[in-house]
From Swiss-Prot:
The active site is at D38. One of its GO terms (molecular function) is RNA binding. It is an enzyme of class 5 (isomerase). Pfam families: TruB_C_2 (PF16198), TruB_N (PF01509). Responsible for synthesis of pseudouridine from uracil-55 in the psi GC loop of transfer RNAs. Belongs to the pseudouridine synthase TruB family. Type 1 subfamily. Its EC number is 5.4.99.25. CDD domains: PseudoU_synth_EcTruB (cd02573). It comes from the Bacteria. GO terms for biological process: mRNA pseudouridine synthesis; tRNA pseudouridine synthesis. This is tRNA pseudouridine synthase B. Keywords: Isomerase, tRNA processing. It comes from Lachnoclostridium phytofermentans (strain ATCC 700394 / DSM 18823 / ISDg) (Clostridium phytofermentans).
């Protein structure tokens, strides 16, 4: 069994929990997720099965899209509403001011990750140190916020012109902590803030609309319809030209050797002008790997094999 399942991670589960449960449901040991979601977050969690686990790092590096709710005026130790409230501040931000500040974060900037995170410092995870009551200096990490769209705001009841909560869609690079983005926006508004809720809506080509909950996957196994929801590995690489290796040259392919153009045929003649990366199939049309053109040696070298 090889492929990728677009799992809807529900609240209360860690990403590790999801993989552990899937091992039981699928009776498959080789399973890995493609980027941690906090236990209280929910949404898209692509899970790789079988030889697709070789893609875990590749998918972790992809851009992501989230929908988050930012609550202004509250500062917590975890940077979300699950933590201990450290401070409450007066909020004076109007919608126009919120819009102005949010737009300033659509850029590349150095973000300080939260103490409650799985980042390791001197071999220890930050959240382990945080639980011991320790707060240590964290190195900023460069992240890119591609876009922030404000989907709606909730005003203060007693002052309707003042914003209490902001619901926003964030498109960002790998390594971005939305909790920390909420913290930073709150600080820029001079009232502080923390994340109330988080849903991941997209990772690469995987979207919220096509996710399956664990119970639904279990049902697919019972009904023997799992193949319908297990995405083939090669679907991630459809933008690359396809080549089929000739039968007599498959021995080179199976051994992970370099290939020259005489070893294969192009699916489309027009694809030959794009000679950067190709997706390679054996003579039986079984997807086998990704190769990259080596200009110095005038051949294609294996990048990732899925044998």
């Amino acid at each position: 069994m090889n492929g990728i399942i677009n799992v809807y991670k529900e609240k209360g589960f860690t990403s590790f929990d999801v993989c552990a449960k899937l091992r039981g449901i699928l009776k498959q040991k080789k399973i890995g997720h493609t980027g941690t979601l906090d236990p209280d977050a929910e949404g898209v969690l692509p899970v790789c099965v079988g030889n697709a686990t070789k893609l875990c790092d590749l998918l972790t590096d992809k851009d992501k899209v989230y929908e988050a709710v930012l609550t202004l005026g509250i500062i917590t130790d975890t940077e979300d509403m699950t933590g201990e409230v450290l401070e409450r501040r007066l909020v004076t931000a109007t919608y126009d001011r919120v819009l102005e500040v949010v737009e300033q974060f659509t850029r590349t900037y150095d973000q300080i990750p939260p103490m409650y995170s799985a980042i390791k410092v001197n071999g220890q995870k930050l959240y382990e140190l945080a639980r011991q009551g320790k707060v240590i200096e964290r190195k900023p990490r460069t992240v890119t916020i591609h876009a922030i769209d404000i989907l709606g705001v909730t005003p203060l009841e007693e002052q309707p012109e003042i914003v209490h909560e902001v619901r926003m869609r964030v498109s960002c690079s790998k390594g971005t902590y939305i909790r920390s983005l909420c913290r930073d926006i709150g600080e820029a508004l001079q009232c502080g803030g923390c994340m109330k809720s988080l849903i991941r809506t997209q990772v690469s080509i995987f979207t919220l609309e096509n996710t399956l909950r664990l119970a639904e996957i279990e049902e697919c196994v019972k009904n023997q319809t799992l193949e319908q929801v297990l995405m083939p590995v090669d679907k991630l690489f459809l933008s690359m030209p396809k080549v089929v290796v000739k039968k007599e040259s498959c021995k080179f392919l199976y051994n992970g050797n370099q290939l020259v153009e005489d070893n294969f045929t192009w699916e489309k003649v027009s694809d030959q002008i794009n000679i950067d990366k190709i997706r390679v199939y054996d003579s039986e049309d079984v997807f086998t790997g990704i190769y990259e053109y080596d200009e110095k040696k005038n051949c294609y070298q294996p990048v990732k094999m899925f044998l």
